[in-house]
Swiss-Prot record:
It catalyses: [(1->4)-alpha-D-glucosyl](n) + ADP-alpha-D-glucose = [(1->4)-alpha-D-glucosyl](n+1) + ADP + H(+). This is Soluble starch synthase 2-1, chloroplastic/amyloplastic. InterPro entries: GS/SS, Starch_synth_cat_dom. One of its GO terms (biological process) is amylopectin biosynthetic process. Expressed in endosperm, leaves, and weakly in roots. It is an enzyme of class 2 (transferase). It comes from the Eukaryota. PANTHER family: GRANULE-BOUND STARCH SYNTHASE 1, CHLOROPLASTIC/AMYLOPLASTIC, STARCH SYNTHASE 2, CHLOROPLASTIC_AMYLOPLASTIC. Disulfide bonds: none annotated. It is found in: Plastid, Amyloplast; Plastid, Chloroplast. Keywords: Amyloplast, Chloroplast, Glycosyltransferase, Plastid, Starch biosynthesis, Transferase, Transit peptide. The gene is SSII-1. Signal peptide: none annotated. Belongs to the glycosyltransferase 1 family. Bacterial/plant glycogen synthase subfamily.
């Protein structure tokens, strides 16, 4: 009985499931198939298995914990487990080649084969005695020790090699790992096998070539070097660099480079209504600095100066209508920006989320359908991204259809099976809700209706696009720890808390960063004219005074250096608490302050801005619309930033404000609670003021304390400014965490 059980585990007879063995089920990440889990729990980059059993096993496998390395599974732990449970029925032999991705030459080393006794006598090297097992274990330890030594040498070399040289090496390795029909997998003597190379003819994309730098001197790929020459080149480069660890942020990512395609409805500086546009414009650059190949796909709302047409036009059917898409491309700061052009996007240039429900839905359907095929049909830098090493990063409900399409159109039909999707929740309040009849616009099989159907106690069954995306995505993210907690509650989940709690195993929060090349008072291009000035931590007092005077002059306010300037920048809707400011306006108007508000959104709230300006013209300005230049200048010239949001997933404006020495007053919710520490006058700590309830009187109380400190305790005020400016708010920190999630999705099976 036991022999039969072990034999069924290890079928087919004589197979080897160690990393890089090509005679079994084919390589997964690291060579072998991934260990199945009853809950499909993902495997993080730091805990990736180096040994796994075949997926066709019907037994439920528990997780094998490795005590030393923290990995979920390892060769040693797995084989010890097998030894303890079926010692007399399993022997260890040496068989197929052990290939370490990008390092080990096929045939230069031998790998461990775990084989059943039945029908495998020719592969046995031990016997059922303790002596045989002891010899086997010694051989195991020797092979594992040698493997670890080789991999450690490789990692050390990568740490020493400069970023530019590493890119050259990666190009060499990547080129030699491209599969082609004339050279079947594993037949070339000189090939380097890449971590994610896939040998299946039907499933592998031929456009997997990775390019990391398009400069002519680095785009030439050497395809004819043999193994020894490549390894020698790596060693020479590593030895030519001084001892020490590289400070280059891509160093830690060099071993696990992936292709990332971020898809969003907006992207700064081309289109922006809120924080999503900033994230789409800045996060990809930080990921690219870590060595990954990164693309951003967004609609083309008008004619932009930078992009150029690339690739052939494609046609997609949306709601029964054929729509032609033209792809435009720009390469900026190491990132490919691809714009989806169709007349359906043009008429919403000034309000990208405008129009009726069905018009918006059609735009998002077209965006997702076109974006998911970009890695096949848009040869950025001459090479398509391909789908063998690919993770899509979708954002909010606008692109929540992408994980669903990836599954329905491709995975279910055997295509792009190694591509993964991650969905980021920026704002759960906007969900893409509609009647069930809207399902006809999505062009999906009828059996996918249940994925979208959600019951609302007030409206009955309805179609919910965000709900479907959350269920279909391989990983789920949101933009702060506080918001991640709120989304699991009935109050903060907006009806999706149940689905999010069910997906808790794949869900986490990562606090956003900011683009410190764009938002930086030292080099802000919007402060170089019209009387504004750049400034630093050392010159913040004089610099902000000059920017305040220039801002007052530009907007037609009295130029007074002693009056505190309060700014509000954001979308005009119920979430942002604009009505709380209006309710507190009688008190604010009596405080000898100037209030400047910038934003666009609901018509009634736009009218509120105009009304407040007309009623208090000597001290209030309400700018309806959005101007990136004015947003930068307001952040530099204001003393206080007001953010009374009822809920705020992360918020970026408070981060921009602190970077510029502007003190935030915020409602303690979501990411605002995570990023703005309440001021403590006794310990001289904190970054601003917070209030606990979204009520006008609480806003007045917090703002009153802030104004009192500004007028009467200048030393404390300057301390607040300096502490805010001294923080590291860059995207590089957040990008490391995003990278871990993307890799976890990539290795999820």
């Amino acid at each position: 009985m036991a022999a039969a059980a072990v034999s069924s585990l290890l079928a087919p007879s004589g197979s080897c499931y160690s990393p890089g063995c090509h005679s079994c089920w084919g390589p997964g990440p690291g060579g072998g198939r991934r260990l199945p889990s009853p809950r499909r729990r993902p495997i993080t980059a730091a805990a990736r298995p180096t040994w796994a059993v075949p997926r066709r096993s019907r037994l439920e496998w528990g997780r094998v914990e490795a005590q030393n390395s923290g990995a979920r599974t390892s060769c040693r732990a797995a084989l010890q487990w097998l030894s303890s449970t079926a010692r007399s029925h399993v022997n260890v032999g040496y068989g197929s080649p052990l290939v370490f991705p990008g390092l080990t030459k096929p045939g230069s080393s031998r790998c461990l084969c775990v084989v059943g006794m039945v029908g495998n006598a020719g592969n046995q090297v031990g016997d059922d005695s303790d002596d045989g097992i002891k010899v086997t274990n010694e051989k195991l330890r020797a092979v594992i020790r040698k493997s670890k030594e080789v991999l450690e040498i490789h990692r050390n070399l990568l740490e020493k090699i400069s970023a530019s040289e590493r890119k050259k090496i990666t190009s060499i390795i990547e080129d030699s790992s491209i599969y082609n029909e004339q050279d079947p997998f594993g037949q070339r003597d000189s090939s380097f096998y890449h971590l994610d190379e896939v040998p299946d003819d039907d499933e592998f994309s031929y456009d997997l070539q990775m390019y990391l730098d398009r400069r002519p001197d680095q785009s030439e790929v050497v395809a004819t070097q043999d193994y020894e020459a490549q390894l020698s080149q790596i060693s020479e480069m590593g030895q030519s660099v001084a001892e020490g660890t590289s400070d280059d942020p891509s160093a830690s990512a060099a071993v696990d480079l992936i292709n990332i395609i971020l898809v969003a409805a907006e992207c700064a500086p081309w289109s922006k209504t809120g924080g999503l546009g900033d994230v789409a414009g800045a996060l990809p650059k930080a990921l690219a600095r870590r060595g990954h190949r990164v693309m951003v796909v967004v609609p083309m709302y008008k004619n932009y100066a930078e992009p150029q047409q690339l690739g052939e036009p494609r046609r997609y059917q949306v709601a029964g209508q054929d729509m032609e898409v033209i792809y435009y491309h720009a390469y900026i700061d190491g990132v490919d920006f691809v714009f989806i052009d169709n007349p359906i996007f043009h008429h919403v240039e000034n309000d990208i989320y405008g129009g009726d429900r069905t018009d918006i839905l059609k735009r998002m359907v077209l965006l997702c359908k076109a974006a998911i095929e970009v890695p096949w049909y848009v040869p950025c830098g001459g090479y398509c991204y391909g789908d063998g090493n690919l993770v899509f990063l979708a954002n909010d409900w606008h692109t929540a259809l992408l994980p669903v399409y990836l599954k329905a159109y491709y995975h279910d039909n055997g295509f792009m099976i190694y591509a993964r999707s991650v969905l980021v929740i920026h704002n759960i309040a906007h969900q893409g809700r509609g009647p069930l009849d809207d399902f006809s616009y999505l062009d999906l099989p009828v059996d996918y209706m249940d994925l979208f159907k959600l019951y609302d106690p007030f409206g009955g069954d309805h179609l919910n696009i965000f709900a479907a995306g959350i269920k279909a995505a391989d990983r789920l993210l949101t933009v702060s720890h506080g918001y991640a907690w709120e989304l699991k509650t009935a109050e903060g989940g907006w009806g999706l808390h149940g689905i999010i709690n069910e997906s808790d195993w794949k869900f986490q929060g990562i606090v956003n960063g900011i683009d410190t090349t764009d938002w930086n008072p030292r080099c802000d291009i919007h402060l170089k004219s019209d009387g504004y000035t750049n400034y630093s931590l050392e010159t913040v007092q004089a610099g902000k005074q000059q920017c305040k005077a220039a801002l007052q002059k530009e907007l037609g306010l009295p130029v007074r250096g002693d009056v505190p300037v309060i700014a509000f920048i954001g979308r005009l809707d119920h979430q942002k608490g604009v009505d709380l400011i209006a309710e507190a306006m009688p008190w604010i108007a009596g405080q000898d302050v100037q209030l400047i508000m910038l934003g666009t959104g609901r018509q009634d709230l736009e009218d509120t801005l105009r009304r407040l300006e007309s009623q208090h013209y000597d001290r209030v300005r309400g700018w309806v619309g959005f101007s990136i230049r004015l947003a930068h200048r307001m952040t530099a010239g204001a003393d206080i930033l007001l953010m009374p949001s009822r809920f705020e997933p992360c918020g970026l404006n408070q981060l921009y404000a602190m970077m510029y020495g502007t003190v935030p007053v915020v409602h303690a919710v979501g990411g605002l609670r995570d990023t703005v520490e309440h001021y403590n006058p006794y310990e001289e700590s904190g970054l601003g003021w917070t209030f606990e309830k979204a009520e006008a009187n609480r806003l007045i109380d917090a703002l009153g304390h802030c104004l009192n400190t500004y007028r009467n305790y200048r030393t404390s005020w300057e301390g607040l400014q300096k502490r805010g400016m001294m923080q590291d708010l860059s995207w590089d920190n957040a990008a490391k965490l995003y990278e871990e999630v993307l890799l976890a999705a990539k290795y999820q099976w």
